[in-house]
């Protein structure tokens, strides 16, 4: 998966167990509309429970006072871009010595131009665009528009989700095959009957999640909520429990009409996702299936950034510096956020960072939620539901191990049988500890091909186990990790361990779960989280002056676009209660997120008459004179 699933990472991992890959067959715009419908229904259902009574908003401090932005990741930087365009003063507080957060590229010292790997976000499944960077509607449209706004669309290069030459490998149960060759991988030894093997993992999984996706799409066409209602009836299920207690195979498969055994579910999970994925929410799996469909379907333009994903936050930071001077406070960890006087409704906000108190009119926090929970919030007046959400909302672990070799052996080398690897981009998959191998897409067709390989990309339980060997500071464990990874690579590629060892130059490994500034890789919702936790943290705290943002607070979480969407919503909340006269320019420059408007129907554009966001703010935050 891409990190943040572009970020922000689990990304879309499509493993073809049988000869054909599957997808939920919607075009890019329809997929985006389904996400909008899902988010709109969650928020609308919650908002409607609040009743019509509005509460007056405390008067805000006089205009001109700074907004504090916590975190210089992509969500914080995007918030700053929006505020700057509206002439709203701001200051960004960042705990580290760099911007970008989980957009992080490691460049190997003394390596060549393309000897780097993206530790965080690494790939961007954008909608189609013209030569000027005008993007068609789609799930990632806002990301594409950001590249264009910054003049970066020419820096995007093809990302090969599938190898540009020969297919990658699958190596499961000690059996190796090129992707698409269609091996059973000795599944009968696991007690998997031949009928299931013949049908294939992808068809079975689509049979389970596809009807939910289709029903959500039908809602859009018929202006109903039937599909949504059915999805919510099953929202309390994990993917595993749904297969165990609810799902029955379609009659067309010719299988017994019975729920799946644990053995079969484990088999599905192994080839479909990562270890433990099916313990997370069913809704999460459905949205994953909808997100981008089949790779290569023509609707998605997979891209990466020439030079690495860090180029994006670095470009934003330079843009902000050029337009408004130095608004960054670096190397300052936030330890407290709250009202200066919790008993006064017009009290300003105070943030303690780097041991110093800093005063703001409002605060937008883009800190990862596990990190935010370690901050002193006693004067922020979070309600019980919000406090529980910070404790409960799940983040998924993720690790990456990048290796610099002397040469790109995965392209130029050959295996023990003399078969050339011939891999350019794409991925290989295995049940060995390294799980996913990602071959570089940058440096292709240049005189400086990348010698760097993402030798292991893991998430969920697989990442937790590999992460135990990362960052220990002990040479013994570093050597153990190196030996494990090289041994796994040799098995997957049918080559000798020593062949790889002789070509190794350097190793860099990263564990997001044990990083004190993230405490996890990306939001990964469990059963029921959408209905409860998601709604509570889209509300502000501290008398409406503490706004939460970040990829976790979007239905598109774990992708860069989720961080952008939530930042857009947080800035809207701030403007609505402080300077609503700026909202027309806000919409003109930064567009609208359709999920925050009632489904207009009849081709009408979202407007103030159908603004779900305004309704949400009024009922959770109060009213102002507009």
Swiss-Prot record:
Practical use: Ammonia is critical for agricultural and chemical industries. The extracellular production of ammonia by yeast (Saccharomyces cerevisiae) expressing LAAO4 can be efficient approach because yeast can avoid growth deficiencies caused by knockout of genes for ammonia assimilation. Moreover, LAAO4 is able to produce ammonia from food processing waste, soybean residues (okara) derived from tofu production, demonstrating that ammonia production by LAAO4 is a promising strategy to utilize food processing wastes.
PTM notes: Out of the 4 glycosylated residues, Asn-54 is hypermannosylated. The presence of a hypermannosylated N-glycan on Asn-54 leads to adoption of a more active conformation in the absence of acid activation.
SUPFAM superfamilies recorded: FAD-linked reductases, C-terminal domain, FAD/NAD(P)-binding domain
GO molecular function, one term: L-amino-acid oxidase activity
GO cellular component, as recorded: extracellular region
This protein's record includes keyword Membrane: no
Reactions that this protein is recorded to catalyse: an L-alpha-amino acid + O2 + H2O = a 2-oxocarboxylate + H2O2 + NH4(+); L-lysine + O2 + H2O = 6-amino-2-oxohexanoate + H2O2 + NH4(+); L-glutamate + O2 + H2O = H2O2 + 2-oxoglutarate + NH4(+); L-arginine + O2 + H2O = 5-guanidino-2-oxopentanoate + H2O2 + NH4(+)
Gene3D superfamilies tied to this protein: 1.10.10.1620, 3.90.660.10, FAD/NAD(P)-binding domain
The EC number(s) this enzyme carries: 1.4.3.-, 1.4.3.11, 1.4.3.14, 1.4.3.2
Required cofactor(s): FAD
Effect of residue 288 to S: Leads to an 1.8-fold increased activity toward L-tryptophan and a decreased activity for L-tyrosine
Protein name, as recorded: L-amino-acid oxidase 4
Organism (species): Hebeloma cylindrosporum
Organismal lineage: Eukaryota, Fungi, Dikarya, Basidiomycota, Agaricomycotina
């Amino acid at each position: 998966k891409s990190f943040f699933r572009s970020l922000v990472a689990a990304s879309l991992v499509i493993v073809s167990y049988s000869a054909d890959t599957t997808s939920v067959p919607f075009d890019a715009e329809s997929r985006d509309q389904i996400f909008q419908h899902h988010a709109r229904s969650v928020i609308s259902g919650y908002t409607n429970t609040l009743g019509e009574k509005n509460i007056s908003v405390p008067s805000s401090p006089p205009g001109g006072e700074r907004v504090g932005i916590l975190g210089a990741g992509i969500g914080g930087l995007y918030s700053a871009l929006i505020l700057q365009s509206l002439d709203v003063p701001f200051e960004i507080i960042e705990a580290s010595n760099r911007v970008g957060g989980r957009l992080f590229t490691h460049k190997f010292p003394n390596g060549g131009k393309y000897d780097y790997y993206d530790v965080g976000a690494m790939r961007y499944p954008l909608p189609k665009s013209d030569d000027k960077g005008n993007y068609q509607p789609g799930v990632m449209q806002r990301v594409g528009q950001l590249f264009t706004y910054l003049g970066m669309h020419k820096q995007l290069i093809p990302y090969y989700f599938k190898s540009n030459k020969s297919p990658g490998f699958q190596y499961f149960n000690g059996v190796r095959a090129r992707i698409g060759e269609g091996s059973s991988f000795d599944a009968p030894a696991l007690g998997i009957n031949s009928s299931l093997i013949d049908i294939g993992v992808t068809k079975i999984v689509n049979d389970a999640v596809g009807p939910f996706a289709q029903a959500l799409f039908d809602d859009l066409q018929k202006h109903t909520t039937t599909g949504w209602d059915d999805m919510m009836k099953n929202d309390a299920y994990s993917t595993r429990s749904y297969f165990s207690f609810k799902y029955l195979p379609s009659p067309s498969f010719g299988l017994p009409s019975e729920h799946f055994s644990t053995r079969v579910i484990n088999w599905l999970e192994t080839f479909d996702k990562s270890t433990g994925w099916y313990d997370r929410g069913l809704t999460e799996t459905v949205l994953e299936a909808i997100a981008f469909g089949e790779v290569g379907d023509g609707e998605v333009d997979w891209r990466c950034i020439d030079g690495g994903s860090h180029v994006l936050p670095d470009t934003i930071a330079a843009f902000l510096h050029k337009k408004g001077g130095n608004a960054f406070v670096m190397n300052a960890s936030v330890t407290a956020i709250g009202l200066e006087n919790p008993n006064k409704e017009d009290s300003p906000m105070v943030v303690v960072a780097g041991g110093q108190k800093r005063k703001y009119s409002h605060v937008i926090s883009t800190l990862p939620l596990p990190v935010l929970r370690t901050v002193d919030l006693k004067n922020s007046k979070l309600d019980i539901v919000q406090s529980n959400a910070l404790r409960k909302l799940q983040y998924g672990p993720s690790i990456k191990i990048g290796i610099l070799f002397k040469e790109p052996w995965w392209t130029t080398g050959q295996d023990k049988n003399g078969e050339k690897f011939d891999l350019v981009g794409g991925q290989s998959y295995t049940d060995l500890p390294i799980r996913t191998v990602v071959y570089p897409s940058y440096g292709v067709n240049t005189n400086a091909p990348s010698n760097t390989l993402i030798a292991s990309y893991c998430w969920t339980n697989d990442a937790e186990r590999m992460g135990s060997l990362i960052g220990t500071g002990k040479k013994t464990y570093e050597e153990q990790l190196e030996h494990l990874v090289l041994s796994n690579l040799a098995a997957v590629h049918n080559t000798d361990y020593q062949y790889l060892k002789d070509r190794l130059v350097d190793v860099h490994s990263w564990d997001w779960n044990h990083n004190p500034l993230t405490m996890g890789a990306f939001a990964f919702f469990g059963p029921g989280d959408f209905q409860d936790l998601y709604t509570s943290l889209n509300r502000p705290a501290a008398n409406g002056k503490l706004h939460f943002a970040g990829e976790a607070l979007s239905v598109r979480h774990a992708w860069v676009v989720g961080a952008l969407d939530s930042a857009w919503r947080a800035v809207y909340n701030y403007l609505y209660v402080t300077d609503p006269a700026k909202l027309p320019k806000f919409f003109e420059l930064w567009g609208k997120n359709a999920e925050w408007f009632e489904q207009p129907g009849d081709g009408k554009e979202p407007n103030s008459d159908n603004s779900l966001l305004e309704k949400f703010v009024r009922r959770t935050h109060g009213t102002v004179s507009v």
